[in-house]
Every structure is written in structure tokens, then in C-alpha cells.
Amino acid sequence: MKDALILKNRLKEARTEKKLSQSALAQLVGVSRNTISSIETGQFNPTAKLALILCIALNKKFEELFYFD
């Protein structure tokens, strides 16, 4: 059996590239700062809808923000 794939992200890099704080990004996409922090640290995987909203907010393609390891 293959090892389980883990969804990872480059959210922090994309956010800092846009000079956004966690709070500012959270407000922009309609979630809490804690949610953004949890996604960035890998403690929480966003729903497909939230992942796409983050992509739009950061002007990134899905595969630029999220990847499997």
C-alpha cells in the first residue's frame, strides 16, 4: 500500500509576496486569522471552495499554492 499523500501549501509565501498579514487575508476571504494560520502550518486543510477563494485572492493557480508531498 502506498503512503498517504499529504496536502501541503505555499500560502505563507504567496501571502507575504502580496504584503498581506494573516488578518488581512482572512478578512479578504471571509475566515478567521486562526484559520489562515492553521492552513499555513498544515494543521487544517481548506475546503475546495476556500482553496479556490484563496487562489483568487492571491492571484495564484491552485497548483501554485497547493501540492501533495
Pin down the residues of each PLM region:
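Short, charged recognition helix plus adjacent turn
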Residues: 1, 66-69
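A short, Lys/Arg-rich alpha-helix, primarily the initiator
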Residues: 1-17
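Residue-level signal for the short linker/turn that defines the boundary of a DNA-recognition helix
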Residues: 9, 20, 46-49
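Alpha-helical residues within the helix-turn-helix
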Residues: 16, 27, 56
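Short alpha-helical DNA-recognition segment
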Residues: 19-38
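Short, conserved catalytic or interaction motifs in soluble domains
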Residues: 41
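DNA major-groove recognition helix of helix-turn-helix/homeodomain DNA-binding modules
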Residues: 49-64
